[in-house]
Amino acid sequence: MNKIYLILILFTFVGIILANVEKAEVSCTCDENCNDGNKCTLDKCNNGCCSNTPININDNDECTVDTCNPKTGISHTPVNCDDGNSCTADSCLCGKGCQHVPIACDDNNACTVDSCSNSTGCCHTPLSCDDNNPCTVDSCSNSTGCCHTPINVDDHNACTEDKCTQSGGVTHTPIACDDKNACTVDSCSNSTGCCHTPLSCDDNNACTVDSCSNSTGCVHTPINVDDHNACTEDKCTQSGGVTHTPIACDDKNACTADSCSNSTGCCHTPITCDDNNACTVDSCSNSTGCCHTPINVDDNNACTEDKCTQSGGVTHTPIACDDKNACTVDSCSNSTGCVHTPLACDDKNPCTVDSCSNSTGCCHTPINVDDNNACTEDKCTQSGGVTHTPINCDDNNKCTVDSCSNSTGCCHTPMSCDDNNPCTVDSCSNSTGCVHTPINVDDNNACTEDKCTQNGGVTHTPIACDDKNACTVDSCSNSTGCCHTPLKCDDNNACTVDSCSNSTGCVHTPINVDDNNACTEDKCTQSGGVTHTPISCDDKNPCTIDSCSNSTGCVHTPMSCDDRNPCTSDFCSWEKGCQHVALSCNDFNACTMDSCSNSTGCTHTPIACDDKNACTVDSCSNSTGCVHTPLTCDDNNPCTVDSCSNSTGCCHTPINVDDHNACTEDKCTQSGGVTHTPIACDDKNACTVDSCSNSTGCCHTPLSCDDNNACTVDSCSNSTGCVHTPINVDDNNACTEDKCTQNGGVTHTPIACDDKNACTVDSCSNSTGCCHTPLKCDDNNPCTVDSCSNSTGCVHTPMNVDDNNACTEDKCTQNGGVTHTPIRCDDLNSCTADSCSNSTGCVHTPINCDDNNKCTADSCSNSTGCCHTPISCDDNNPCTVDSCSNSTGCCHTPINVDDNNPCTEDKCTQSGGVTHTPIGCNDNNACTVDSCSNSTGCTHTPMKCDDNNPCTIDSCSNSTGCVHTPMNCDDGNFCTLDSCCSTGCTHTPIIIDDNNPCTVDSCCNSTGVVHTPVDCNDNNVLTCDYCSIKQGGKCIHVPMTQCKTFGKCGDDL
């Protein structure tokens, strides 16, 4: 079109030029003479010549086409800006020309998809809200758009999990309430859901500790009554107390030594009955103990001397009856032996033994009062009695056990002071007795706990110095012990308040510089001062009004360009400020009536397309108008019959799948088939028998728990099933045995309290049970010792009045006293010296032929008198020197094998040689150096285990020797570097500075070094906050618009 206008203009100018050429020669006197009849020229008369100049038709308006018609003159026709695009609003702006602004097609209906067609204009296509989810109801709201409302599957039963299936059905699956905890009873309440009731584990037994294991359930652990003493019987009482009753170890066997070991219990050690006498038969009687029965050497011939030899053989040596004594007539009778009729030599002196000497006649020898007991002083009294007064063996030495041996006299046995404690040095003081001095375990180190171990070793355990205070540095001084040095918390930062928390350690709290004015930048200076610098809020945007609020900071309020005219589009331009562009209301939609109201703005009133037919989908085409599309009722569900009603719309009638069997779940499958699945009737109740009836469905018949036992109470537990609890038959009478009979009755049979002990009176107490009262055996007889035998009862043993003197007649008097009346020993035989031996009684000693020479065998011959035959002293022992002393007799002196060296064991061999075997001094203790001194014997010198290393704990193990255990210097403080040096443990504070001024460095004793980033947040969302490492940790707050990258602030800005 513009080209046409240009051609017209060109033709017009050509015509004007041609006309002027034709009239170039016209002469004139005034302008009127020059009118060429063309309104497109300016006619002038200049110097008598006409000039017809084309006039300027340009109105400088780009929105007009300027033309000139010679007949009608100038015209300014508006430019046609229609670009043939229905999606633009075409207009012309002064200075800019045609403008093609895209139109807005938003119909403010969230249920349409808005678009624009260049040919037809705006299109509003109905939105499809089908989410292909059968478990939602799909709809559309004009204001919010598609709505997918989940279908309601809740059956209001907290014990089921309610779901919608892929086919759109609803399932209610019982939830599993098992919490896998055997200590709870799991159940489900329809209203509240799973219940986990704690299981009661009390077994009403005071002797068990009741607890519960999550995996196995109730645990009834018997309480530990063991006192680790095998000599006691350990029991728990009904009240929960503990008794430790000593056990009886008497095995009633006199042939064992009964004792008890705390570790192993009763010990019955067989006693040794060997008396080292080959002439006795050694045995033991379980009732009386050791028996030493002399072997029978008697050949029933009084005329032989019957003997048992040292080797156990028997000799019968004919006796010599010739006493070589003219004072006797010697003979021998096989029945009575030698007969020596003595002379009457009685001198009427009870203290002499009257005899007759073959050479001198009667001899009156003082009687032998020696009782062969070295422990008595023996005397003869004027009445002829013999006294044996015990001697005093006390040596006034507390380090000896004083006793007396009948054969050797007083014995002073060194006392054993070994207390079986390896931690004491045992010695003895003559005045006070045993002394047990604790060994010195002190290592003079206040940082160790010094102890002596059970095996005699010494341990030096480092003590713990942790005072649980994070504000102290804990260490230990070998001289003074634990040290708790206050922690230095000064961080040399004037902008923090330094303090210490006992639990966490140093705290460096930044001082508060906030003046509560968001319009200032608050800082703390290096000297500790505070500055509040006003911030700049200019955002260089002409479309905002910049200000600052003390509470929130910079405020950039958008400038309002609203001219209160809804028919203009108001906006603000960075270059020109507020702009008001006329609004085009043509939506080019055949489905709306378009208009604009100064009060309400553009209105696009939808036309009504409803044809009142529910079987059509009514819509409107932006290009053609109303459209009535038949409704598609196929729901793609093979389990429904689809149809449509003009009044109600689509109908989806479910096909009938019911097989009239209440025991099946009837369903239609996705392929359109029908399934009848048996339903599960398990009600998870162990007290019902679950079944199903085709007519009524699930049946839960109560379980019969009758066990046909009249002695139980039958019940049922929903979780475990039948419970058969024994009935209580206890009559609270400890004297009856309570039972339940087969018919359900209860019997209380008296218990038998007979303890088979004849020394107790047996009875029964209803509260405590059997009582066994000791039997009273006092017979009121002072001459009996009253006791009791468990098998026979009371025993009244006559009092032992025996004074062990066979020379007295011993009696008990009626008042309980004892008399010892000397007996008469006169046998009216003059050939014997009559006396009495305290041990054997009357002794009728043949007259003494002793020549006081122990080297002769003295005898008496009826015809010749005393005989003195030299004796043989050979003991057939090559290790003795045999000799004879007239005063003492045979002497068998052991040869001297002692080499005066205590380090050898000296022996004489069977061949008579001498050996000196070095002794072993090994005490099997690796902590001693064993050696032997020729002067003192074995020595066991304690080994020195000090390795002069302060970083080891030196001790000694009896089995392996010196042990150098590295000292544990760990003080449990993550803020110290623990090591050991020449002075012992050191705990050096670690370096926590990470050389980053943007972190607050600290150390927690329990966790170690913490580098906490400096908090630079000024709580202003319009600034980018960071800590600058380059500026020594200074907080920087940059306007967000100046940040280079989204979400990143730092030294790279």
UniProtKB/Swiss-Prot annotation:
GO terms for cellular component: extracellular matrix; extracellular region. X- repeats lie at residues 38-60, 61-84, 85-108, 565-588. B- repeats lie at residues 157-180, 229-252, 301-324, 373-396, 445-468, 517-540, 661-684, 733-756, 805-828, 901-924. Induction: By the putative stalk-specific morphogen DIF (differentiation inducing factor). Pfam families: Dicty_CTDC (PF00526). Residues 38-1019 are annotated as: 41 X 24 AA tandem repeats, Cys-rich. It comes from the Eukaryota. This is Prestalk protein. It comes from Dictyostelium discoideum. The gene is ecmB.
